[in-house]
Amino acid sequence: MAAKSDGRLKMKKSSDVAFTPLQNSDHSGSVQGLAPGLPSGSGAEDEEAAGGGCCPDGGGCSRCCCCCAGSGSSAGSGGSGGVAGPGGGGAGSAALCLRLGREQRRYSLWDCLWILAAVAVYFADVGTDVWLAVDYYLRGQRWWFGLTLFFVVLGSLSVQVFSFRWFVHDFSTEDSATAAAASSCPQPGADCKTVVGGGSAAGEGEARPSTPQRQASNASKSNIAAANSGSNSSGATRASGKHRSASCSFCIWLLQSLIHIFQLGQIWRYFHTIYLGIRSRQSGENDRWRFYWKMVYEYADVSMLHLLATFLESAPQLVLQLCIIVQTHSLQALQGFTAAASLVSLAWALASYQKALRDSRDDKKPISYMAVIIQFCWHFFTIAARVITFALFASVFQLYFGIFIVLHWCIMTFWIVHCETEFCITKWEEIVFDMVVGIIYIFSWFNVKEGRTRCRLFIYYFVILLENTALSALWYLYKAPQIADAFAIPALCVVFSSFLTGVVFMLMYYAFFHPNGPRFGQSPSCACEDPAAAFPLPPDVATSTLRSISNNRSVVSDRDQKFAERDGCVPVFQVRPTAPSTPSSRPPRIEESVIKIDLFRNRYPAWERHVLDRSLRKAILAFECSPSPPRLQYKDDALIQERLEYETTL
C-alpha cells in the first residue's frame, strides 16, 4: 500500500501499510506526516496550505469535530488536497467529517464472564471429542476411533497454524514499528513522528506555525517520549537495551512456539484477552483505551479461530456421531454429550464472531449480550435441524449423502461468487475464499457481503427448508424396517420444530434486538428520507455544523423564512442562535488521530474486514503518544456513509 500526502491509503499488491494520522485541533487540522522507511527529517513534514488557516482566506471552512486536515483549496505546495468548495478555491469549503465514534467503553465483568464461557465451551467441545475417541479405542471400534480423532486433530492443527502465523506477523510488525519510532525520535523530548511499515513517503510540505493547541500537544508528547526514551542518552545504555530486547524476544518466541506445539494457542489467546481487559481497567486515562482496543482486537482474532475450528472439527464431528447413533440404534451418554457440545460450539462461534466484529469496528454499533443470546438460539436450532436431517439421510444413503454435500457446496459457492465478494486481490484467491465460505453454507448462514440481507436470507433459508424436507422424506420412505414409526415420527417433528424455532429467533433478532433498530417495516424510500437520523451527533457538533454553513446558504435560509411566514409553519431546517465560541465557553477538545483510508469499507465482507483490520491494527496501536484512540475513516460511496464517515462537499 502506498500513502498520499492527504493521508489516504491506496491498496496495491503488497503487504506494506503506510498512512498519515490527522491530528485534531480547535481551528484547523494539523497533519502529522508519516514517512515509512525514511529517516527523521527526510520524510513528510507537518503540512498546511498557504494562508495559515483551515481555508486560504481564513474563513468559510468548517471541520465538524476538527478531524479532517485538508484545506479548502490546494493552493501552495504540499497542500493536503482538501475538497474544493462550491465557490472555488477562494471561497473555501465546508468539508465535513461527521464523527460516528461511540463513547469510550470499559471492560466490564460481563465481558470477562463471556470470555470464560467461551473457554468452557471450547474445553467441553474438544474434551468430549477426545474422551469419546478414547472410548471407541478401548471398545475396539477402531474405524470410529480414527474418524473421531481425525476431525479433532484437523481442527486443532489448522487453528494452531493460523494462530502462530498471526503471532509472527503481529510480533514482527510491532518490532519494526518500535524500531522505526525509536529511530525517528533520536532525542528525549523531540516531537516524535511515528514510522509505520514500509513504502513511499507521505509527502513534503511547509513547517506548521506554532499554535497553543499544538504547543500543548507537543508538550504532552514530549513528556511521554521523555519518559519512554530516558534511557537512550548513551551508547552503552542503548546497547544493553538492545541485548535485553533480543533476550526478551527469544523468550517470547520460545514460549509461543511451545504453546502452539502443545495445541494451546487458542486457550492462550482467550486468557491473554482477559489479561488485556484487566489491564485496561487498572491503567490510567491515557493508557486505558490502548489496552481496551488491544483486548478487542485479540478477542476478534480468537473468535475467528474458534469459528474456523468449529467448521473443521465440530460440524463434521456432530454429523459423524449422529450417523453412528442412527446406525447402531442406541444412544450412549458420552455420544449425546459430544453431539450437544459440538452443536453448542457451532452456535456459539457464529454468535460470538458477530459480536467481536461489531465491537472491533468504529462504524458499527456494538451488539448487546441479549442480542448475542438471541443469535445463539437462532443458530443453535437451525443447525440442529440441519445436522439431524443429515444424520437421518446418511444412515440410509451414504453414497448419495456425499453427492448431495458436494452438489450443495458447489451451488452455494457459485452463489457466493455471483455476489461478487471482494476478499482477495487476485481473482483465483477470491474463488478459493468463496469455496471456503461455501463449506460454512452447508450448515448455516454466514453473511459475506455488506448491505441489505433480507432477500439473501429468505433465499438461503427457503432452500434449506426444501432440502431438509426432501432429505427427511426420503429417509422416512426408505428407512430400515426395524425403525418403527414411534421413533421416525418424533424425529421428523424434532427436525421441523427445531428449524421453525430457529427462524422465529432470527425474526426476533431483526425485529427487536438488532443494534441499528428494527429491520422490518422499513421501505427503501423511508430509509433515505433522513439519512442522518440514525446517527445522532453531539449537540456542540451539530450546532457548529449548522452555524458554519449558514453564511454559505443565506439566500436559501431567507427564502425558507419567507415561505414559513407565508404558510404559517416553522421551516424544517433552522439555525438556532448560540453563544459565541470562546475558549472559556467550550470544553477543551482532546487531540485525536484520524487515519483516512481511501478504500470502500462497506464493499468488503465481514471476514475480509477482519483481515484488513489485522494489517492495520498494530500500526494504529503504535501511536503511543496519542492521548485518545486513533479512528479509522473509510471512504464509501453510499449516501449515508458518505455524509457521516467521509469528506462531503456542501
Curated annotation (Swiss-Prot):
Q: Name one GO cellular component term.
A: plasma membrane
**Bias-annotated ranges (Basic and acidic residues):** 1-15
Pfam families with a match to the protein in the record? XK-related (PF09815)
Q: One of this protein's GO BP terms?
A: phosphatidylserine exposure on apoptotic cell surface
Residue numbers spanned by region Disordered: 1-44, 200-238
Residues the record marks as site: Cleavage:
567-568
**Polar residues bias locations:** 21-31
Q: Where in the cell is it found?
A: Cell membrane
Q: How is its activity regulated?
A: Phospholipid scramblase activity is activated upon caspase cleavage to generate the XK-related protein 4, processed form. Does not act prior the onset of apoptosis.
- Predominantly, its location class is membrane
Name the domain of life. Answer: Eukaryota
Q: Please provide the record's keywords in A-Z order.
A: Apoptosis, Cell membrane, Membrane, Phosphoprotein, Transmembrane, Transmembrane helix
Q: Hey, which family's this protein in?
A: Belongs to the XK family.
- Protein name (record): XK-related protein 4
Q: Which organism is it from?
A: Pan troglodytes
Q: Which gene is transcribed and translated to give this protein?
A: XKR4Q5GH76
